[in-house]
Swiss-Prot record:
<dbReference type="InterPro" id="IPR048024">
    <property type="entry name" value="Fxna-like_M28_dom"/>
</dbReference>
<keyword id="KW-0645">Protease</keyword>
<dbReference type="GO" id="GO:0046872">
    <property type="term" value="F:metal ion binding"/>
</dbReference>
<feature type="topological domain" description="Vacuolar">
    <location>
        <begin position="31"/>
        <end position="405"/>
    </location>
</feature>
<protein>
    <recommendedName>
        <fullName>Vacuolar membrane protease</fullName>
        <ecNumber>3.4.-.-</ecNumber>
    </recommendedName>
</protein>
<dbReference type="GO" id="GO:0005774">
    <property type="term" value="C:vacuolar membrane"/>
</dbReference>
<feature type="topological domain" description="Vacuolar">
    <location>
        <begin position="737"/>
        <end position="758"/>
    </location>
</feature>
<keyword id="KW-0472">Membrane</keyword>
<feature type="binding site">
    <location>
        <position position="198"/>
    </location>
    <ligand>
        <name>Zn(2+) 1</name>
    </ligand>
</feature>
<dbReference type="InterPro" id="IPR053976">
    <property type="entry name" value="PFF1_TM"/>
</dbReference>
<feature type="glycosylation site" description="N-linked (GlcNAc...) asparagine">
    <location>
        <position position="48"/>
    </location>
</feature>
<feature type="site" description="Transition state stabilizer">
    <location>
        <position position="330"/>
    </location>
</feature>
<keyword id="KW-1133">Transmembrane helix</keyword>
<comment type="function">
    <text>May be involved in vacuolar sorting and osmoregulation.</text>
</comment>
<feature type="topological domain" description="Vacuolar">
    <location>
        <begin position="807"/>
        <end position="1040"/>
    </location>
</feature>
<keyword id="KW-0812">Transmembrane</keyword>
<feature type="region of interest" description="Disordered">
    <location>
        <begin position="563"/>
        <end position="680"/>
    </location>
</feature>
Length: 1040
């Protein structure tokens, strides 16, 4: 009966395939399908999934960007919903402007609602190349934004009473020292998407969090702030406005609920530290890895969420929980409830409630105390520690400290090589170090030929296979095993893995210590498993005989073979004289005779011959020892020199053989007078040690070597490989497969956004390599069926991928839309940005582009592979004003933007020029102000001062200011100042351009170019916004 886990092709193929399939199939299913939603509407007290879904359908009926009418409707609905929830739960609540009246009653309201129409923020934003219509060299940007956030404070059991957040509550005392937990989502969408997952699900999750914690019996230990912010989609404006709110200094921790995809599972995008992840770790269906968090930290992922503002500007500690796929629907009209699911909603909702409960329930010192960086202006929320985390099958969560992993990594780097060196020393002392041993000599017969061990076979084989996958591994490894079979192949593969893993671990350990990068945890686990597997390969050598004993056995087998061969030949030569039989025996190559095949006999017979034939030596000393039958030499094995003779008889014969050969000397021995005694050349061929090594196969009956591997390998335990594979395989397959699938899903459709196309392919290669790596020590034992099947799969899929069109109705290509108008001249352009190869066919389908020239140029705001293609848009003029034109197209935009710019000087300082610029635009909340010369100082009337948490005012000035009002048709007043010599009237050095944005496309006919695109573009294409405005109108101004 075959051992079911023996190291033979059948068991190896069966178990490796079974384990791979048993792990990969559920991983793929878990990656693609969110966990099932509960069948009941109220899965637990205080949560109603049906209600949440209804709210989602209500707020996603239309596009609702900040600069739209429906955005204001959504805000009113959310305020009404907040009031409805609080009334339904019987909670005592007030608006913040009613706190004084409530305080007279001597009772603190359980909930306070902040309808924030006051907070605004002015800040620096970094650099850009201007706008699409006003491209320039890189200039500094600034922004002024008026917030319309909704904040709901839920008082905790341990919170102070009253309106403790007011500045004059208790002077000189830290109020509500335990801090608050923020749950945040944004209720605006992009102008081309309905925002079901970005961020409608986050909004209704916040409403359910409010419902849960205001339900009787669910009051949190520490206070919770539920924030529904507005204006995230453009530059995270809502979170920036939070910085001006009176509750912000008391927020220690947060959960940001976001959407960067359009469904599926919600992943932990990133987190600040181990302690906040401990709050998430015990959710029912955790999903995420620290690799994603480190990818953000190292700049590999540039997508921004409110998390960036909360952490970098305010110093809060928290988690970014977000949807991440499919990117093809992200920011498009397919981000709607039709393409979302209750399962996705339940996944993010259940995780949010659990995490918030844990964060607000921490009443210790975890999130309070002095900051390690002692940063001014940031909340004092304790000392965070770096963590390592990842999920397993979306069901359990692994979380531990980075310092612990660093210690673990350092131990592996130092201890594991020393342990292997120690094992090697022990094996050497036991004479069982078969690794790196090619031959061995016996001490009993040092003059004998060295016996081949074959210990180097397989050492150089694995290194060349690092960069190829299953079939290539199998094909070359199996071929190498066929040509030069080696029982040490598995051990050397483990050794190579250990060496390469150790080198990688050096880099991983350095990153852990220097950069606090935890993403290398996979390599720490991998090297640990490789070390244990390698240790098994070394320890199993203890089952082998000593090399000297093996060599001695081979020598004895060699001697016995010669004498038993002589006896067999003697029995088969009845027609010859005894002298002839003796000569035949001597010619067969006994230890006492020369190799006739290599040196012919002399014609003159030496003493002790009969009729010119040699007399056979005595074999009595060996005749009683059973010997194996001679084995055929294996192809590829070299033939060694003969063992030197040691008997006096040999010396005599050697002397006689020194006679010079003549033309009568036979080719194969004997003499010229009686050469008929020879039968065949084969009977006189002298066998070498290399060939006779195979005769040692039966020196022990407890094991047979596999096929043509070294004869001593039969002693190796045939089951050891199975435990090595269990160490190397399952856990690494889980880590590599689920992490690779998750990250590939997150980035494989980002090429159309301008990201590098090489990144997804590199990621696929890297994780595929990690996925196959555990199989490499054993792959040469896999039968041909699996590799050949995978080769066929590769050929078929490669052919399909090369022939098939890359996009479809379910996985659409995203083109970026924008329309640009010079309101003074009426110039009108419609532009699409993307990969030119796909953008041109999209434009070709548009009726308004028919017969018009399409010009393409490199896009300054996207990647190097992205182009912007434009054509005359006069056939599709937008209706930008608030006046009802009775369906007629708007043909005059001159008065839609009004700019008044007047010059002034500071008293007593003629070297500084100042200007007051008033801007009014019809039917919009957003205009940008771009200067020809950067301004050295800038203020917005009625605005707050500069918020230095987002950066100091740049020394080289600001060239572009983004202006946002919370109301339509409101005038901006900007005071600008330039340093330098006085300028005269008529100089244009300090002039500029106003660019205003229109983003409301809910009413058909408002932006006909977009309506046309949604109707006529191919089914494989989607249209999304390029920048803040779907339509940008510009107007130049001069300072007078």
């Amino acid at each position: 009966m075959i051992n079911p886990i023996s190291f033979r092709p059948g068991p190896v193929t069966f178990w490796t395939t079974l384990i791979y399939l048993a792990l990969l199939i559920p991983i793929v299913i878990i990656n693609e399908e969110p966990p099932a939603a509960p069948k009941t509407a109220e899965p637990f007290k205080g949560v109603n999934l049906t209600e949440a879904w209804l709210d989602l359908t209500t707020i996603t009926r239309a596009y609702h960007p900040y600069n739209s009418k429906f955005n204001e409707e959504v805000r009113r609905y959310l305020l009404e919903k907040v009031e409805s929830i609080l009334e339904e739960n019987g909670a005592t609540w007030v608006f913040d402007d009613q706190m004084a009246a409530a305080a007279k009653d001597g009772k603190s309201a359980a909930v306070t609602v902040f309808d924030d129409n006051v907070s605004n923020s002015t800040f620096v934003m970094g650099k850009s190349n201007g706008t699409t219509f006003t491209r320039t060299e890189s200039i500094n940007n600034a922004a002024y934004f008026e917030g319309t956030n909704i904040l709901v404070y839920i008082r905790g059991k341990e919170d102070d009473d009253g309106d403790w957040w007011e500045a004059d509550y208790v002077h000189g005392m830290r109020r509500n020292a335990k801090g608050l937990t923020l749950v945040n989502a944004h209720y605006d969408s992009v102008s081309t998407g309905f925002g079901a997952t970005d961020d409608g699900m986050g909004v209704v999750t916040c409403l359910q969090v409010l419902k849960y914690f205001t339900t009787p019996g669910n009051q949190p230990q520490r206070g919770i702030v539920v924030m529904l912010n507005n204006g995230e989609e453009d530059w995270l404006y809502g979170a920036r406005a939070l910085g001006q709110h009176k509750l912000n200094p008391f927020i220690h921790t947060f959960l940001n609920v976001e959407g960067a995809g359009a469904g599926g599972r919600a992943i932990v995008f990133r987190a600040t530290d181990r302690e906040v992840m401990a709050a998430y770790a015990r959710t029912s269906h955790p999903f995420g890895t620290v690799i994603a968090s480190d990818a953000f930290g190292m700049g590999f992922i540039s997508s921004g969420t409110d998390y960036s503002v909360l952490v970098d500007a305010y110093g809060q500690r928290g988690i970014d929980l977000a949807f991440f796929k499919p990117r093809a629907r992200y920011h498009t009209n397919q981000d709607d409830t039709r393409h979302a699911s209750k399962e996705s909603l339940w996944h993010i909702l259940s995780a949010s409630i659990h995490t918030t409960k844990q964060l607000s329930g921490d009443t210790g010192n975890t999130f309070i105390g002095q900051r390690p960086d002692k940063a001014h202006g940031k909340v004092a929320n304790g000392r965070p520690s770096n963590g390592v985390w990842f999920d397993l099958f979306g069901k359990s969560f692994v979380l531990f400290g980075l310092r612990g992993m660093f210690a673990w990594s350092l131990t592996l780097l130092i201890a594991t090589p020393l342990i292997l060196v120690g094992i090697t020393w022990l094996l050497r002392n036991l004479d069982k170090d078969y690794f790196f041993t090619s031959t061995v000599k016996t001490k009993e017969h040092p003059e004998y030929e060295a016996v081949p061990i074959g210990g180097w076979k397989g050492f150089f084989r694995w290194a060349m296979m690092v960069s190829i996958f299953y079939f290539s591994f199998w094909m070359i490894m199996r071929g190498a095993n066929f040509v030069r079979p080696s029982a040490l192949h598995r051990g050397y593969a483990n050794l190579w893995l250990f060496v390469f893993g150790w080198i990688v671990l050096v880099a991983v350990t350095a990153l852990e210590d220097r950069r606090r990068i935890a993403a290398g945890y996979i390599f720490v686990f991998l090297e640990s498993a490789i070390f244990l597997s390698c240790l098994i390969s070394f320890v199993e050598l203890l089952a082998l005989p000593r090399k000297s004993a093996y060599a001695l056995q081979v020598q004895e087998d060699y001697d016995g073979h010669d004498h038993s061969g002589y006896q067999g030949y003697r029995d088969s030569t009845d027609g010859l004289s005894s002298g002839a039989r003796a000569e035949s025996s001597a010619s067969a190559g006994s230890p006492s005779s020369p190799t006739v095949a290599q040196e012919p006999s002399k014609p003159t017979a030496p003493a002790g011959t009969t009729n010119g034939l040699s007399t056979a030596p005595s074999v009595a000393a060996h005749s009683s020892q059973p010997q194996p039958a001679p084995a055929t030499p294996t192809p590829g094995r070299s033939t060694s020199a003969p063992i030197p003779s040691t008997t006096p008889r040999d010396e005599d014969e050697s002397e006689d053989d020194d006679d010079e050969a003549t033309e009568r000397t036979p080719l194969v021995g004997g003499n010229g007078t009686n050469d008929r005694g020879r039968t065949t050349f084969a009977t006189t061929y002298r066998r070498s040690i290399t060939a006779l090594v195979h005769g040692a196969r039966k020196m022990e009956e407890d094991g047979e070597p596999y096929e043509h591997e070294q004869d001593w390998s039969g002693h190796l335990p045939s089951w050891a490989w199975f435990f090595q594979f269990l160490l190397l395989g399952p856990f690494m397959i889980i880590l590599a497969a689920q992490t690779g699938l998750m990250l590939t899903d997150a980035v494989y459709q980002t090429g159309s956004d301008g990201s590098k196309l090489f990144t997804p392919y590199l990621m696929i290669f890297f994780f595929t390599l990690l996925l196959i790596l555990p199989l490499t020590p054993f792959i040469h034992r896999v039968t041909h069926h699996i590799p050949v099947f995978l080769l066929v799969v590769f050929i078929v899929t490669l052919t399909y991928n090369l022939i098939a069109f890359p996009f479809s109705a379910n996985n659409r290509y995203k083109a970026f839309f924008g329309q640009y108008i010079d309101v003074a001249t009426g110039e009108n352009k419609v532009c699409y940005t993307g990969i030119e190869e796909y953008v041109r066919p999209i434009i070709a389908e548009l009726p308004s582009a028919s017969g018009r020239d399409v010009t393409c140029g490199k896009s300054l705001r996207r990647g190097s592979t992205i182009a912007t293609c434009c054509f005359d848009g006069s056939a599709v003029p937008p209706k930008l004003g608030s006046e009802d034109l009775d369906g007629l197209p708007q043909d005059n935009y001159a008065d839609i933007i009004t700019v008044n710019a007047t010059r002034s000087h500071k008293k007593g300082d003629s070297s500084r020029t100042t200007a007051r610029i008033e801007i009014t635009a019809d039917n919009t909340k957003s205009c940008f102000l771009q200067f020809k010369k950067p301004v050295s100082a800038l203020t917005i009337e009625s605005g707050s001062g500069w918020d230095d948490r987002f950066g100091q005012y740049p020394e080289d000035g600001v060239g572009l200011v983004r202006l946002w009002h919370r109301e339509f048709d409101k005038t901006w007043v900007v005071n600008a100042e330039w340093k330098g010599s006085e300028t005269r009237k008529g100089d244009d050095e300090n002039d500029g351009t106003v660019i205003c944005m229109w983003s409301d496309a809910n009413t058909p006919g408002t932006i006909p170019a977009l309506d046309e695109a949604l109707q006529f573009v191919p089914s494989w294409a989607a249209v999304t916004k390029f920048s803040e405005g779907l339509v940008e109108g510009r107007k130049a101004f001069k300072i007078v």
